[in-house]
Amino acid sequence: MKVKIHSKHIPFKLKAAMHSMCGYAISSLGISDRLAKNLNLTIHMGHHECEGEARVAKDSNRYRPRDFKIYLDHHRMDVDDYNRTLEGTEWGHRVLKTLAHELVHVKQYIRGELSWRDAGLLW
């Protein structure tokens, strides 16, 4: 599995944790090692409409996708549900939690549980 992380001003330890999280989550979600070797994950950290989103890459096969883009808006993760400002490890845990959630969607795309329909709708 190839994992590329595009980010600025993110600590190296968090990037390493994100890379490890991808391998651990894909294997624990029941994706075989043979299939996992062919996966390409590109993680973009920056401003986005929501905290996280997982998509099939534009040039990937729509019916058997192997290339995915994951968008994480780490700026929205600074404040929790109670309007507390998250600092240090709390913020890192929130980023990893959101990444894990988006990796579940990647698993759904791979297994065909989530697929593209007409006009870009997901079903």
Spans of features found by a protein language model:
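Surface-exposed beta-strand edges and their flanking turn/coil or helix-capping segments
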Residues: 16-20, 83-87, 121-123
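Auxiliary, metal-adjacent structural segments of Zn-dependent hydrolase domains
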Residues: 12-72
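Histidine-centered divalent metal-coordination motifs
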Residues: 101, 105
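Post-HEXXH active-site segment of zinc metalloproteases
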Residues: 89, 93-97, 109-123
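Active-site scaffold of zinc-dependent metalloenzymes
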Residues: 50-93, 106-110
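Acidic/histidine-rich, surface-exposed loop or edge segments in extracytoplasmic proteins
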Residues: 1-8
